[in-house]
């Protein structure tokens, strides 16, 4: 499967499968996966549907297959008081229907403090 679309909230593959993030916002923090920062080479790769996921605590996560892993940086923009936790999901598409995403990772994102 190949990447067909990258937005601020997800990565979509040509078979309809998606990778996306979630964070239960408390108040004044913004935790997110910066999907738009993936390497341009990732658009050319043909991934197996059985993706592997690895967290890189305080920096982001990697996904892909043996020998072809793509890094996605993750950030938490806040004042340092709130959680930096972010969850990553992988949702398969079956017969054109996007199924509920399976939770694949949970970790602390890189804090980008503001005053």
Q: What are these regions, as identified by a protein language model?
A:
Residues 1-115:
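Surface-exposed, interaction-prone regions used to assemble/regulate multi-protein complexes
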């Amino acid at each position: 499967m190949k990447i067909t679309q990258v937005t601020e909230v997800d990565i979509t593959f040509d078979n309809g499968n998606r990778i996306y993030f979630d964070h239960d916002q408390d108040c004044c923090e913004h935790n997110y996966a910066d999907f738009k920062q993936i390497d341009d080479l990732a658009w050319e790769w043909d991934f197996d549907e059985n993706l592997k996921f690895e967290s890189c605590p305080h920096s982001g996560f990697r996904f892909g297959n043996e020998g072809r892993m793509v890094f996605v940086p993750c950030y938490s923009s806040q004042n340092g008081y709130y959680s930096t936790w972010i969850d990553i999901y992988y949702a398969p598409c079956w017969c054109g229907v996007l199924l509920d995403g399976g939770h694949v990772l949970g970790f602390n994102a890189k804090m980008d403090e503001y005053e």
